[in-house]
C-alpha cells in the first residue's frame, strides 16, 4: 500500500500487467490516456502464447508476430475501467489474445 506522507492516508494501488499484440500499441496508449493513467513501463518485444486460444507470438519464421507488454501501478479505483478497456480491445481481435493481470502493490517508494 502507498502511504500519503502528508495525511498518512492509505491509497490502495494495483499493478496491472498487460500483454498485447505489438500492432495495438497506439490503442493501448490511447486507453491509458483516456483513464488518465500516465506512468507505465513498456517492453516492446516479448514472446508468448495463450493458455487456451490464440496464436503463438514467437518472432520466428513459423510464428512471426511478437507481443508487447506494459505494467502500470494504478489506484484500485481505476482497475475495473482499465480491464474493461482491455476486454473491448481484445474483442476486436480475439486471436491476438490481449490479456491483463492485476497484482497487489505492497509498497512503493
Regions found by a protein language model. Name each.
Residues 2-109:
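Positively charged, small/polar-rich N-terminal and surface patches that mediate targeting and assembly
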Amino acid at each position: 500500500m502507498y502511504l500519503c506522507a502528508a495525511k498518512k492516508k492509505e491509497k490502495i494501488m494495483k499493478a496491472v500487467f498487460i500483454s498485447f499484440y505489438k500492432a495495438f500499441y497506439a490503442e493501448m496508449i490511447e486507453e491509458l490516456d483516456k483513464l488518465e493513467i500516465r506512468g507505465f513501463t513498456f517492453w516492446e518485444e516479448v514472446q508468448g502464447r495463450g493458455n487456451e486460444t490464440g496464436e503463438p507470438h514467437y518472432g520466428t519464421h513459423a510464428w512471426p508476430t511478437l507481443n508487447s507488454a506494459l505494467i502500470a501501478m494504478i489506484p484500485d479505483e481505476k482497475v475495473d475501467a482499465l480491464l474493461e478497456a482491455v476486454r473491448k480491445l481484445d474483442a476486436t481481435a480475439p486471436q491476438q489474445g490481449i490479456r491483463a493481470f492485476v497484482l497487489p502493490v505492497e509498497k512503493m517508494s
